[in-house]
Amino acid sequence: MSMFSLFSVIAASTAAIILSLASLPQNSSSGDDRSPKTGADSHPLARAASAAVSRGVDKNYIELLLQDSMSSFDEKYVRTNVTNFATKPDYSHNWNSEAVASVREFLTKHENLLHRADSIHGVPPSIIAALLWVETKHGRVTGKHHVPSVYLSVMLSNEPAFIESNTLLVMKAKSIDSSKIDSVRESLTKRADRKVNWAAQQLKALHAIQVRKTMNTLTLRGSWAGAFGLTQFLPSSYLSSAADGNGDGLIDLYQLDDAVFSVANYLDRAGWGKTPEQQRKAIHHYNNSDDYVEAVMRLAKMSGE
């Protein structure tokens, strides 16, 4: 197939998806339609778009995403976001000698910025520096996944075929006996439904950010969970906690001043206090993992010694 022909196919496919969206009301009732689709609606992006609009995501924003060549469907986002609980992440590398040295260097280099954030939000520089290391190695690893595509893909998590494949994956990962497949499938179905609703909320948040014009959400790159920037905020976290650290009127989480102030603001809003219990609870709110909390707290302590 020539390059011209390939582009023609892509353009025609996108047009068909948008045309199928045009027939949808802005906020139609979602119901629970998991039946196989045909025609234009058989395209995964078309199904994802319809599911998003039916859950209240702005139709014009979805159409804008579909017209962008970066937007795509990828089953790996359905798989990873629904089944990630089956494998336990290892955070131990986050307090090795390289990590400690890097955080100490960061604390020295950005002392004034960190203390400014601390003076407003009461979050120690060592905690901010440690958290940013655990999240993105101080901006070295922010993720290459197209954020809108992550959430569009997750919108299809509760389709039967994906529930079945994810059920088998979880059973294998956790060595679950085949006799328990029905209970695992039921659990995965409920989890998939929650993930679909979660993805819709994140798409709504992306639209709100786009309206604010503080970041261009169409080109956002981040993690497999759609978290982005040095802080690895979800779009909803951006709306609630992102802060302008340099007074330029924008909030760019790939910019260090904004990232530092946003982490401090997030933890402050999450109840950061003087007791270890309050501090651990605030970090746990940032990432719902005891091992994550331990990694941040341990790295902060080791870097300050």
Where are the predicted features?
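Cell-wall glycan-active module
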Residues: 1-226, 236-305
